[in-house]
Amino acid sequence: MKNLFVLFLIFCASFCFAQKEDLRKAIKEESINGALDFSKMLEEKYSSAPFIRFGNTLYNKKDFAILLWGAKVKNLGIESLDETIKLWEEIHNKKLTTPESKALKVGFKTKFE
């Protein structure tokens, strides 16, 4: 019985890991020119506006797209801010700047309904 329980735990852990890897892969695929690329939508919707107000802060379109990406990734199931930052940097092959990092953190912590 004890061995069966251990095998069950190992199976559950490997299944959860596989699901998380599938999620990361899907996020990577959709983040550039896909459903998680908010830059085109923002450019179309706010073409004449240089900045977008969110709360008491003005964001340029690039940073606001990162904010929306952070919120969506959290909503999809990535629970760690550090993992989200690392994932964004892997996708874009560069480190986040300070304003980009702040926008990502705000998006990650914001609950959209």
Where on the chain are the PLM-derived regions?
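Sec-dependent N-terminal signal peptides
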Residues: 4-13
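Active-site or metal-binding loop neighborhoods of secreted/extracellular toxin and effector enzymes
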Residues: 80-113
